[in-house]
Structures are given as structure tokens and as C-alpha cells.
């Protein structure tokens, strides 16, 4: 058995089974290597989307840096075998400056870079992240950091935007109207998880506070908003407000829809509310879709 010098890292590696590199015969420089994905011939079909998923990368949402989860894609002509996927990351790095600003204009610029670098007609991106914002307790006005989940979706073909979407998921309180109606006192309440997917005007810029407008529609129509910090006067207000505004899941999504339909920069929306029922072992949910 071969003895290795265990006082060195290389010796320890070989002691645990590492071997020397094989002296091969294939090229070792980029210019000499075969570039298979750049092969051009008839590959039968065009591909609408090909790219990468689950790329974690820093993003800026308003004043906070957070982690974004990206999916990038481009189209692929039928006479090309594949795309050069490393160019996707190169395009992302080109737009990096302490995080990619999560706004539609920034994502549009990123897609144009990707489109040109990949030499393809179409490109798309979906990116999810945690949106942090200031939230004040309702009576004592104590500031703390609240959060919601956001997902941006954008796609372009040539110079035209073909998809422009924003999804927000936030948690609220819902108090059961039936429980309030039949009980001598009190009513059961629970945490509701509300998801709004808004299909935005593809031909115009969004208004400055578009996220806040959608979030307000989701939260203000619930029995109560969730707060990071509540003192006793705040808790009293929250409890009483919930009792004054009972909501079924059906009620909540209809009220949210009534607000969203008034926004001329929204072309349509999908809404879902799922209640984690406090008196059942199952959840309750409601869902609706609307297109103008």
C-alpha cells in the first residue's frame, strides 16, 4: 500500500482516495473545443421558452435588499440546437449594482440585453422576492417592518411587451360572519392568505405606488390587517375592527375585485383567498378571475 505524506493537503487527499488528473487528448482551450449548442441545421421545431430556473440573486425592492428567485428564458429558432446559457448569467451580471432593482423598467432593460446577447426574438423573466415595508401600529403608531411576497413577470418579443404581471401574496385576519351571527358573544377568526395576480397594461408605465395600491385593496377589505408590533390599545383596536368587519373568503375576494377593477392600469386579475380555519382541520378557499 502506498504511503502518503499526511502533513500536506495533497497527501491527505490521496490518502482518502483522490487521484492525479488524466492526461487526455481533447482540446483544453475554448477556441479549439467543439461548441455543440451552436450547431446549425434543421432541428424540426422552434422552442418558445428555454433557459434557467431557480437562480438566487440579490434584488432591491424599494429601499431594502433581499434575495430574488429568478427564471429566465428566450426563444430558440428551429435551425439552432441550443442556447448559450452562460450568457444569461453574463447579462444578469451586467445589470448588477448591489442588487437588481425589482421594477418593470429595469427588468425590461435586462430582457433587451438578454435578447441581444442571445440573438433571439423573445425573452422572459419571472422573479420572486420578499417585499419589506414600514408598518405602523394603528393606535400607538409604532413603526416596524412588515412584509409581503411579490412576483414580477415580464416577457418581450422583438420590441413589444407581451406579458406584464405582478403577483402579491399577503396575510390578513378574517373573522367568520356565521360564527358572529349565531354566537351570543365572540366569533372565531383565522389568518387568511390572499394572493392577487394582476395583469398590467403592457403599453404604458405603471403608476409609482402600484404595489401599495394592490396591497391596500387586499388588506383594507379584510377583517383586519396584520401588524408586526401591537401594544394593548392597538390589540383592542384590531380585535374590535375584526368583529366589526366579518368576512367569508367569498366576501373578501369580491371586495378586493371591486377595488382592483377600478384601476385603469390593470387589465385583469386572478384572486385567491385561503383561510387556515381555526375551528376545522381543513382550509377554506375562494378564487375568481376577471378580464376587462
From Swiss-Prot:
Query: Which keywords does the record carry?
Result: Hydrolase
MF GO annotations: GTP cyclohydrolase I activity
Q: Which residues form the signal peptide?
A: none
| Record-listed E.C. numbers | 3.5.4.16
What protein name applies here? GTP cyclohydrolase FolE2
Record GO biological process: tetrahydrofolate biosynthetic process
The record describes the protein's role as:
Converts GTP to 7,8-dihydroneopterin triphosphate.
Please state which protein family the record places this protein in: Belongs to the GTP cyclohydrolase IV family.
Reactions this protein catalyses: GTP + H2O = 7,8-dihydroneopterin 3'-triphosphate + formate + H(+)
Matches recorded under PANTHER family: GTP CYCLOHYDROLASE MPTA
One Pfam family assigned to this protein is GCHY-1
| Site feature May be catalytically important, where | 176
The metabolic or biological pathway listed in the UniProt record of this protein is: Cofactor biosynthesis; 7,8-dihydroneopterin triphosphate biosynthesis; 7,8-dihydroneopterin triphosphate from GTP: step 1/1
Disulfide linkage: none
